[in-house]
Design a protein with these regions (language model features):
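A short, amphipathic beta-strand motif
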Residues: 1-4, 32
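Short, acidic Ser/Thr/Gly-rich low-complexity loop/linker segments typical of extracellular
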Residues: 21-33
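Extracellular beta-sheet/turn segments enriched in Thr/Pro/Gly and aliphatic residues
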Residues: 65-99, 213-220
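Ser/Thr/Gly/Pro-rich, low-complexity flexible regions
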Residues: 99-220
């Protein structure tokens, strides 16, 4: 996929078994299909999906006692027949300015963005966290339910209102809370995944280049 919701070429994606030595990998064909030889003695493994200009994605798998393979998501096994990957491209969006303010019963988010792509879908990811002055993609607590959300944008100025009383984003905010916010360019398909070894959550398509510092609001 491109950085929006549009299709890109299905060919040329490299799929490899993580930590295999020698490296076991395959490249997708024009239909997006690939074949990997798998050692029958391998009971758990991760597949790594990469393509130039696209974010890296990992998916974890396990083999049960009956030799059936499942993929693992949020510590739960699922049948591989239901597994499909949509690899998104990296975001081209740079945040030039970002602000947040309370307007009536809404949180107004305004931004100015630039991208070399004049047309096509573009998105920014807004981060939220209470009492975190240095909020960034590296410091925000990604285990929280409402730590971020994605907004569509166009080159230039953008404005978006979030209902304080009805949005799930604000569900655990209380009057007087100081909420810190930051913004980054991201893609519709963020390729977000949690590393099973470190438990860290990664957003491979996020553009870390932002020209603005975090902002804050006081919940009325």
């Amino acid at each position: 996929m491109n950085e929006g919701n549009g299709f890109a070429s299905k060919s040329g994606m490299t799929v490899s078994i993580e930590n295999s030595s020698p490296v076991i990998s395959a490249v997708t064909d024009s239909s997006g299909n690939f074949t990997l030889p798998l050692d029958p003695s391998l009971h758990s493994f991760a597949l790594v999906y990469t393509k130039p200009g696209f974010g890296t994605f990992k998916r974890y798998y396990m083999r049960d006692a009956s030799n059936k393979i499942y993929y693992v998501d949020n510590n739960s096994p699922y049948q591989t027949e239901n597994a499909s990957e949509s690899l998104g491209s990296k975001s081209t969006v740079t945040i030039n300015s970002f602000s947040a303010s309370i307007i009536g019963d809404a949180l107004r988010l305004t931004s100015n963005i630039s991208s070399p792509n004049a047309s096509g879908e573009k998105y920014i990811r807004i981060l939220y966290q209470k009492d975190l002055p240095g909020i960034s993609i590296n410091t925000v607590d990604k285990t929280k339910t409402n730590w971020s959300h994605l907004l569509p944008v166009t080159n230039g100025d953008n404005s978006f209102d979030v209902c304080l009383a009805c949005s799930t984003i604000c569900a655990d905010w209380k009057p007087g809370d100081k909420i810190y916010l930051a913004a980054y360019g991201d893609s519709f398909y963020s390729n977000m995944y949690q590393d099973q070894t470190t438990s860290k959550i990664f957003l491979p398509n996020l553009n870390p280049n932002t020209n603005v510092i975090p902002v804050s609001i006081i919940v009325p």
